[in-house]
Every structure is written in C-alpha cells, then in structure tokens.
UniProtKB/Swiss-Prot annotation:
The gene is reep3-a. It comes from Xenopus laevis (African clawed frog). Residues 199-214 have a biased composition (Acidic residues). One of its GO terms (molecular function) is microtubule binding. This is Receptor expression-enhancing protein 3-A. Keywords: Cell cycle, Cell division, Endoplasmic reticulum, Membrane, Microtubule, Mitosis, Transmembrane, Transmembrane helix.
Amino acid sequence: MVSWIICKAVVLVFGMLYPAYFSYKAVRTKNVKEYVRWMMYWIVFALYTVTEAIADLTLSWFPLYYELKIAFVVWLLSPYTRGASLLYRKFLHPLLSSKEKEIDDYIVQAKEKGYETMVHFGKQGLNLAANAAVTAAVKGQGAITERLRSFSMHDLTAVQGDETSENRPFATFPDGQKKARASVSDSSGFGSLRKDSGDDNTDEDVEVNSEDEVYTQKGLRRSQSMRSVKVIKGRKEIRYASLKHKPKKRPQLYFREDTAHHL
C-alpha cells in the first residue's frame, strides 16, 4: 500500500507536472528543439499510461512492481538517459509511419459508426422511456379503477348518509318517534271531533229564550268549529266512517207578542 502511494505521487509530480511546465516554456520561447523533445515525451507517456492501466490489473502482484514503475518514469524523464526520445525514434516512429493510413481509416469509420450508433441507441432509449411512461400510466389507471370497484354500494350510501347528517342544521327523529307523534296527533284530532260533536248535541238540547243568546251561541259554535277545522287541516286528516255526524235541524223560534212588546 505504501509503495502504491509513493509510486502514484512520483508519477504525478515527475511524470506529469514537471514535463507540463517545461512544455509551456518551450511553447512560450518558441524553442523548436525543446518543443520536439517534449512532444516525443508526451507521445511515449500516453502509451505508458495505457500500458500501466493493463499492467495494474495483471502484473501488480509481481515483486517490486511499483518500484520498477518509478524507475521507468525517471528513465523517461532524465536528461542524461533521454529514454522518451530513444523509445520514440527506435520503436514508435517506425511503427506509426507504417500504420498511419490504416489508423486514419479506423478513425474515420469510428466517427461514422459512432454517430450512427449514438443515434440508434438514442432512439431505443427514447422508445424505452415512452413505453415505460405508458406502462406506468396504464398501471396507475388500473389501480385506481380497482380501488373504486372495491367500494360497494352500501359503503357509498353510508358515506352519503354521513355527509347529509353532518350538513343538517337540526337533528331528525327516528321513524318510531315519527309514528308515535303521528298517532298522538291523530288521537288528539279525534278527541277534538268528539268534543265538538258533544258540544253540538248539548247546544241542540238547550232551549233558547232570546235572540241575543242565539247569536252569542252561534258565534261560539262557529269559533269552536273553525278552531277544530284549523287543527285538523294543520295535521294529517284521517277519515273515520263511524264518526259521520248528521246535524239535526234546529227548531224554528217564534217570539211571542208580549215579549216583543216588552222589548
């Protein structure tokens, strides 16, 4: 682990930062000799980076592997050995010169195929995204319909009943109390009818001796009958066949001459 950390630090500092600074100076001073030297170094270092990535996966178990990497970077960079210039002139330049045309063709084909591949995979990605969105929408709609079907009509009526009971301004009576009240009102109306009929019978039996008493009794009888009619109209009318009453004809009143003379 310590060897890996030291190796990584040496490669970053001496293999990248130091050459980058001197490459800047070569470009600024327009020194062609130094410019060519550092260009050859960067070509060799790029090849070294690719080889290092493969070797770290396959040869990292080898003894003194990281120490050998440090020594190789120093050998490439040292002005005394000039390892980068040596590798480039002896191996890389002849190889690249012989394979230059093939490499250019591969690059052009890679660009064309890369564009077509990108468009193809882009279309597939859009189709997959659209299908996923439609599937999610259909599943969501199906879940909502199943949820609505799970409710029975009894549950819906119960919910409506709860809402109407909450919105009522006053409490309602149950059906039993309504029937009891209706029976009480009917019985009271029936009692008033019997009372009125009894009053009529007693009025018929009484003999009237004066015209003033006749008018006063008629007014009382009319007021009682009107009150009974109002009570019956305000409540539920119930007809009873056995309670039909036929009023008797009142006897005609004859006034004597003596009483008229006194009046």
